[in-house]
Amino acid sequence: MSTDNKQSLRAITLAAIGVVYGDIGTSPLYTLRECLSGQFGFGVERDAVFGFLSLIFWLLILVVSLKYLSFVMRADNAGEGGILTLMSLAGRNTSARMTSFLVIIGLIGGSFFYGEVVITPAISVLSAIEGLEIIAPQLDTWVVPLAIIVLTLLFAIQKHGTGLVGKLFAPIMLAWFLILAALGLRGIMGNPEVLQALNPIWAVHFFLEYKTVSFVALGAVVLSITGVEALYADMGHFGKLPIRLAWFTVVLPSLVLNYFGQGALLLKNPEAIKNPFFLLAPDWALVPMLIIATLATVIASQAVISGVFSLTRQAVRLGYLSPMRIIHTSEMESGQIYIPFINWLLYVAVVIVIVSFEHSSNLAAAYGIAVTGTMVLTSILSTTVAYRNWHWNKFLVALILVGLLCIDLPLFSANLDKIVSGGWLPLTLGLVMFIVMTTWKSERFRLLRRMHEHGNSLEAMIASLEKSPPVRVPGTAVYMSRAQKVIPFALMHNLKHNKVLHERVILLTLRTEDAPYVHNVRRVQIEQLSPTFWRVVASYGWRETPNVEEVFHRCGLEGLSCRMMETSFFMSHESLIVGKRPWYLRLRGKLYLILQRNALRAPDQFEIPPNRVIELGTQVEI
């Protein structure tokens, strides 16, 4: 590897540390405290400490190192990852029925992420600022207000992008992990016997010793791997090698050292259970630790917010969410986007959660169920990809799936016990998002099918118009068409009411490909249907934003020139009414009407000059 390549790899690896590992990197703030807080019927006992440390270590090895970094990350769509990408890959070579099943699994996984994303900023920032209770116990009433202030500032700066402050993420998080390692070493040196917990026999002994209670306690151990999905979701930003390199050289050693350092401290001083992370530090370092812990949790929250923006854009482009305003905050990096509606909706939800739960320990009960649910779904989808796409031996795939589920299902089942004490929150949020996504997709399909079910043949209509043309007016008319072989509603209504046709007519279809990006060579396909009719199909990836001016620039390069200020864009605007249907479908229809009314209009969605747009209304019953 050349010197330049090595330097580039180091830079990308450092950047990955700053973004990808924020969530899992701040888990030591609260994980061991929740494991040994006494809620499971046992306190800070030697067997319990060793058992939990062994479970945490082997979860980091089996789930993060083996499952995600070695297996799941093999499944990429042009380098991109994430649960919806995995869903798309899994459904490529399957039957229609199987594809529908896999789509449901993928949407549930995406919905779980929306449920989790509300909790992550709240529990992360709260757990950091709770260090104030160690420094100055009399200021404990300020924890919630300070957490809200920090998160308010974080959400407020989203519209300006993270390009400038993002450059600080990597060095801050690198410093954070080095501090984790140093504090952990300090604790281990005081009680080296804690390293015995590296032996998996202590995890087995934990289950034998504490029996039924040990299974429920798995729900707390899961806190150590929250954020593991980010490794796969952010693969497109950094690549597989930098993410893997960052984990094995910096993140994993730092996490293991810190967890074992906390364990060593608790064996010497069981009273440190009130906050073993901060009490691991010397007194003089508490204030600096509070500051850098807060910065680290803000960065972890930023990574989650950016993740929900990316997931939302992908869902919009794939047709699972209604179009909404997406603002690019960087001219250099297409992945840096801002979605105002999602940003402020998430902010309100996070503030409500902080005010309602007040303490990170209360929120810990709500955390984990969405994470483990997504892990189960990821196992199913990734093994489907291995069998269908990679053509692995079915017995090997079955063995891998059984092995993965032997880990995932107990973790998920253990978290079901949390539903009453807080787990209902991510489940409810996830259910709402699942209903919204399936409603938009299915009702949109019903609407388009109803609009086109009585349509005449496009070829026959064009032939008729060429044979007996109506009055022709100068200029070019562009009719937006959702389907290539269907007569656009706007064209039919223009002929019906205005009884004129432009000299040149272009039927434009904007299509989303099953890929993050589409090369410019494949951007535009032009087909001349008659002397005065053309069909243009423009293809975009789900990480790209369609732009009509760019489309016609590409058309001009291929011989079909259009001047935007001499072109009229005709679009149909549907006024929807809910027809006779069962009560539950009426409710879904009304939800769709609400989503439709608040959706971004096509001219704004496709960046068409508003003074060149003509909308023709039509009423459609759904």
From Swiss-Prot:
InterPro entries in the cross-refs: K+_transporter, K_trans_C, K_trans_N, Kup
Signal peptide: none
One Gene Ontology cellular component: plasma membrane
Chain ranges passing through the membrane: 12-32, 49-69, 101-121, 134-154, 163-183, 213-233, 247-267, 276-296, 337-357, 363-383, 395-415, 419-439
Domain of life from the UniProt record: Bacteria
Any GO molecular function: potassium ion transmembrane transporter activity
Recorded family membership: Belongs to the HAK/KUP transporter (TC 2.A.72) family.
PANTHER family linked: LOW AFFINITY POTASSIUM TRANSPORT SYSTEM PROTEIN KUP, OSMOTIC STRESS POTASSIUM TRANSPORTER
Designated name of the protein: Low affinity potassium transport system protein Kup
Protein species of origin: Enterobacter sp. (strain 638)
